[in-house]
Amino acid sequence: YMWRINKALPRRGNIGIFNRSHYEDVVVTRVHDLIENDKIPKDLVNKNIWKTRYRQIRDWERYLAENGFHIIKIFLHVSKDEQRDRLAERILNKKKNWKFSIADINERRFWDRYQDLYSEMIEETSTEKAPWYIVPADNKWFTRYVVSQIVLKAMKDIAPKFPEMSKEIKEQLEEFKKLIESGNIGMIEEMQDVMKGGNK
């Protein structure tokens, strides 16, 4: 269940955003008893499978952190009443009809089960290197503000910098600068000589 997430990891220096990700496999899969349909050895489907998956997730996220990944996990918590109002708005407001899905209505029947599993998931997988941030999400402006502050702090902690240029590249840039300032930027041959390290 982790392979699809693992292969979608961002390259070093890039940022990746996962919507739900591997955490579906310890929540949705349990709500709807989908584990029996997974193509995994049957002897692995036992009473310890969820504890095992929690451990695997913690181990995987620790591995990522130890290899330079900065992990931010945000849980947007919408109340049951607010969810009801938003679903009603999607039905009543023509401009929001495109957001409507009957699946969202059906899932509300499992609200309590979801809340129990979300709580367990957060407790089992929130760690020092990969903590969960639980953000109240009834008020969208407040949610966006809190999330932006979480991301901003993380970016400040990471303190990203532009790649360092080699001495050779810096020298080539100076030559290009001279070409531009002298009005000779169109002289392709001369620019090619500069790239080769020449200086005619």
Where are these regions (language model features)?
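Conserved nucleotide-sensing/catalytic segment adjacent to the nucleotide-binding pocket
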Residues: 1-49
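Conserved catalytic network of the ASCE P-loop NTPase/AAA+ motor domain
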Residues: 7-11, 63-69, 125-127
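NTP-dependent small-molecule kinase module
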Residues: 114-200
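Alpha-helical scaffold elements adjacent to nucleotide-binding pockets in ATP/GTP-utilizing enzyme cores
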Residues: 1-8, 26-30, 56-60, 83-86, ...
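Flexible, active-site-adjacent loop/turn segments at secondary-structure boundaries
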Residues: 7, 20-29, 33, 96-98, ...
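A glycine- and Lys/Arg-enriched "phosphate-lid" helix/loop adjacent to the NTP-binding pocket
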Residues: 30-54, 64-116, 163-170
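A structural signal for short, well-ordered beta-strand segments and their strand-loop junctions
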Residues: 16-19, 71-75, 134
